[in-house]
Amino acid sequence: MNKNLEANRNRTLSEGIHKNIKVRAPKIDKTAISPYDRYCDGYGMPGAYGNGYVSVLKVSVGTVKKTDDILLDGIVSYDRAEINDAYVGQINMLTASSFCGVAGQVWGHDLATHDSIANDEIKPLYELKQFDGTPLKVYDAKPLLEAGIELFGTEKNRRFTTAPGAHVICANKSATAYRPKENRPLKEGEAYGVWSFIALSLSNDRDHCADLFIEDAGLWTKNDNPEDLKKFLEDHRKAVTWSVVECGRDSHVVFERTYIGFAYVIMKPGEIGNALTCAPYVTLARDAVPSEGFPSLNRISLSQWLDDMNFDSLVNPSKK
């Protein structure tokens, strides 16, 4: 490596008066621009500019009234989970298991950093000890989930969605169940509710190690009380992050932090519910890239990106 070239690639950024941060330029081309002006595209599809990709986080649920064809009901409930919250409808979802690698970056953390992360306003929910004794700080994934909504938009207010019919690799899992209309004991595969988790753990050496996705999904069969289900999920976070620590142990990877979030729904009697967790790997729509170029996304906050796009915030309408 040419040390002078390496020094030139690194840079110092000002975050305010007497407050500078060192930013290390990536050794790998992480540019990720799709061939479409208004659409994101799946990673690895023809016509993209750059070697990189962008990971976007999403957890959502969908329900449908049961008909006499449970297979079709499952399709519709899954489709509704795709279109709710951050819009990822009309895609051919391909499954990956499940890392954001050295060519990838995370929307809302690395690119267009959510303001609560950029301003160091978020606090850990709890900590776990990793295999080497290093503490793993676990944060709510809400900022990253909000960032996904701001990028893709919603079903009623679409922005830079994935191209209709695009083939999109995603880290994903889902759970589907029927809640019977009658008040009777549940049968196998039936439930009062469904839920899904997503956890993203950032390696402490992202030049040489991958970030880890853990997805989890399941059925709630105890009762139809949403508060009880929510309490279960809040407790279940520690089981999900336990798996993070164990996967880190397996590959001797230490993580700097974990973001974790969940979605859930208690179905009405006679409904089928689906809980989806997914993280699409995409290249960004050309128009989603500021005029200063793709690297500028590493330097701006989500609110600055919204200003650059002349968008109002979808998750906080009082702000741009």
Curated annotation (Swiss-Prot):
Keywords: Decarboxylase, Lyase, Pyruvate, Zymogen. InterPro entries: His_de-COase_proenz, Pyr-dep_his-deCO2ase_N, Pyr-dep_his/arg-deCO2ase, Pyr-dep_his/arg-deCO2ase_sand. GO terms for biological process: L-histidine metabolic process. The active site is at E215. Binds 1 pyruvoyl group covalently per subunit. Its EC number is 4.1.1.22. Its cofactor is pyruvate. The modification Pyruvic acid (Ser) is found at S98. One of its GO terms (molecular function) is histidine decarboxylase activity. It holds the Pfam family HDC. It catalyses: L-histidine + H(+) = histamine + CO2. It is an enzyme of class 4 (lyase). The record marks S97, S98 as: Cleavage (non-hydrolytic). Residues 2-11 form a propeptide. It comes from the Bacteria. The proenzyme is a hexamer of identical pi chains; each pi chain monomer is cleaved to form a small (or beta) chain and a large (or alpha) chain by non-hydrolytic self-catalysis. This is Histidine decarboxylase proenzyme. It comes from Clostridium perfringens (strain ATCC 13124 / DSM 756 / JCM 1290 / NCIMB 6125 / NCTC 8237 / Type A).
